[in-house]
């Protein structure tokens, strides 16, 4: 399942995402992963969740972002939730590419039965 948190800059998308990450980290029977562009969520996200910085892996573009998601999932079958912050900054502002990316992630979600949440 894919969920999108959509809103304008400053609308509280990241704050809502952090709440969801921390809630999932407390209640999930598996592992929780949060992917963000830089290191802004370091002290906001629970230590029980795995925080990954896309910039550490030079991720730019939706194909690379999908590769990261698939690789993270392939490396750990115990992951139940994957959260992504600043999706447009990691990928691009090309909405056609965003739609294609979300379709691929939806297929990955259906195949692996994992939950994905992104801020847009």
Task: Locate predicted features.
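Conserved P-loop
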Residues: 1-73
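A structural signal for short coil/turn segments at secondary-structure junctions
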Residues: 27-28, 76-77, 109-112
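A general secondary-structure junction signal
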Residues: 36, 86, 118-120
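A short acidic (Asp/Glu
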Residues: 45, 93-94
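Conserved P-loop NTPase "ATPase switch" module shared by AAA+ and STAND
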Residues: 77-93
